[in-house]
């Protein structure tokens, strides 16, 4: 790591009881859930209009960070996923969620030699970069991660074709509303997904799919203004996001084997 290692924070990859790295099934399912939700919003925007109006109204409200917009997200997810009618009185009850029919296993253990320490690099829209004193244990590029995806067809009709189409729409939205605003950033391919805690807020949020590029920037900026702490001088690092045309105004990168790449980008193969 070099001389700076004394001041460097190292974030470890999650490991099983035997010390082997793996990806929790809950993380993979959460990623798929977000992608499927974004797909439904893009394809059926009209049915989300009321929820969108509620979200627009509530974004400016002062709430504890732990509950900020939680009711809004619950409302939006209920529209997309709660279709089982097991509890007709409470549509939002988890027993009505069709994603109960999607079971994702933890990944198979990953060889410890397939971990590499990567420094976090933040790239700005104009291409400027700066690194921060955090190293992450990351899975090496090109490593195959195996997991089992089981769909109970009696509960939901999500199949391979729907998942691939959802991923394609997700990448199109992410490329257009986010990556395109960063000089030199590589677009995601149609079968790419983004996984992991270090990949950034924009890859995990629905606001661009719901509001589009222009209004999505303002919406996400306002969310970050309400949830991210101000700097010591009282300024907020996301205040100028609207003027920059993208929010957040940072894309997460790293350098591995002399090549720069976006954090968390994976190719999804179902077979």
Kindly label every feature range from the protein language model.
Residues 81-86, 108:
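Transmembrane alpha-helical segments of multi-pass membrane glycosylation machinery
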Residues 31-42:
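Short active-site loop/helix that positions an aromatic residue
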Residues 92-271:
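Basic polyanion-binding and macromolecular-assembly surfaces
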Residues 25:
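Short, conserved phosphate/pyrophosphate- and ester-handling motifs at nucleotide-, phospho-/glycolipid
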Residues 1-21, 33-34:
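Long, hydrophobic/aromatic-enriched structural stretches that serve as scaffold segments
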Residues 41-83:
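Short, glycine/acidic-rich hinge or "gate" loops at secondary-structure transitions
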